[in-house]
């Protein structure tokens, strides 16, 4: 193992768990966009500035976890901005079951409605329809990244009705003022998404932005079956290490609610998920020395060991389910229906 991990090009090394690593690789993060997964890293302990609640609907198996990052202490501990993070987990989302997807849409719509209410975005309070801009983030040409654009394909926009029939049209019919845009990715447009949205927001003056995006997860079991809703905005590309200008209330001037589904996971994270099984197998096979060595390394060191072995061979690869096209298509309907239910109520 020592020989395998030795790198002549980089003389500076550090010893982790009895194994020498390249110093340059020691600083890293296990990439995930899910606040729930960040919270799970410190499962069982109370974290100052973090509040967690969870509940499950037995009849549907839909599980909801609420992670609230309350202040700077929580922000530092979790690595997530202050805000509310709601995670809907439903294993049956992996199947094509229209009735079940509708149940998830209803649950998500209720959570979205509640989050809008927290920000004072209610027709009753405002005395007029809520003006909402839905943004479909991602690259429509790359299936795992096409969730946002797909949701926009199913969106029932209404803003144009005001332009055609008068500014009172939506209020009279009980409709929200709903518009949408798919800004593409920087490689296609040459512009940051935030730059595009600032122009659109200045012209259309929405009360809120709903940003839909594909996310990265740490665990394979969450791919395509987990939906995260957050009022902390969104940071395009952060889950795969591709940092872009953030889309937040501070940068755009209106509340930004993010809806995301993990569609990719890092190859090293997949291997990390199997370390426990590997350790057990090594011990059972009489290789207790190697098993004990890996077992006694903490999760961070295990992950670093895996990256040290894996990435020189294949690079920082990301993996997606084989039927991701079908999953993205189904989930795009689920999310678009949730948006319609939350904003139209019984008038959609």
Show the residue positions of the predicted features.
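A structural-propensity feature for long, helix-poor, extended segments
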Residues: 170-200
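Glycine-rich phosphate/diphosphate-binding loop of Rossmann-like nucleotide-binding domains
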Residues: 139-176, 180
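Polybasic, lysine-rich low-complexity intrinsically disordered segments
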Residues: 9-13
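Proline-aspartate-enriched helix->loop->beta-strand connector
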Residues: 201, 206-207
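N-terminal amphipathic/basic leader segments beginning at the initiator methionine
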Residues: 18-81
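Short glycine-rich or small-residue beta-strand-to-loop segments that form or flank ligand, phosphate
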Residues: 87-91, 131-142, 180-184
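A structural signal for small-residue-enriched, beta-sheet-centric alpha/beta enzyme cores
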Residues: 181-182, 211-348
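An N-terminal, well-structured beta->alpha segment
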Residues: 72-118
């Amino acid at each position: 193992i020592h020989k395998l991990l030795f790198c002549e090009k980089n003389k500076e090394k550090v010893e982790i768990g009895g194994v020498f690593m390249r110093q340059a690789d020691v600083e890293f993060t296990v990439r995930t966009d899910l606040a729930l997964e960040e919270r799970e890293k410190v499962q069982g302990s109370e974290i100052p500035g973090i509040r967690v609640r969870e509940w499950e609907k037995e009849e549907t198996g839909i599980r909801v976890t609420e992670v609230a990052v309350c202040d700077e202490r929580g922000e530092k501990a979790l690595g997530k901005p202050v805000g509310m993070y709601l995670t809907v987990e439903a294993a049956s989302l992996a199947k094509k079951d229209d009735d079940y997807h509708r149940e998830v849409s209803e649950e998500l719509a209720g959570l979205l409605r509640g989050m809008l209410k927290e920000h004072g975005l209610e027709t009753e309070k405002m005395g007029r329809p809520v003006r909402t801009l839905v943004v479909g983030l991602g690259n429509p040409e790359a299936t795992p990244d096409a969730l946002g654009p797909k949701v926009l394909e199913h969106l029932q926009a209404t803003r144009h009705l005001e332009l055609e029939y008068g500014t009172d049209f939506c209020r009279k019919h009980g409709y929200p003022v709903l518009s949408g845009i798919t800004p593409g990715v920087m490689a296609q447009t040459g512009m940051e998404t935030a730059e595009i949205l600032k122009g659109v927001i200045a012209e259309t003056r929405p009360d809120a932005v709903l940003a839909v995006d594909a996310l990265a997860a740490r665990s394979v079991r969450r791919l395509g079956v987990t939906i995260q809703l957050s009022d902390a905005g969104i940071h395009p590309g952060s889950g795969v290490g591709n940092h872009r200008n953030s889309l937040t209330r501070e940068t755009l001037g209106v509340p930004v609610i993010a809806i995301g589904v993990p569609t990719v996971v890092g190859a090293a994270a997949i291997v990390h998920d199997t370390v426990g099984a590997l350790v057990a197998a090594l011990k059972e096979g009489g290789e207790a020395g190697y098993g004990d060595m890996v077992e006694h390394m903490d999760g961070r060191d295990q992950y670093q060991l895996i990256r040290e072995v894996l990435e020189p061979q294949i690079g920082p690869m990301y993996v997606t389910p084989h039927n991701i096209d079908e999953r993205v298509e189904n989930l795009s309907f689920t999310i678009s229906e949730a948006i319609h239910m939350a904003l139209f109520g019984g008038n959609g």
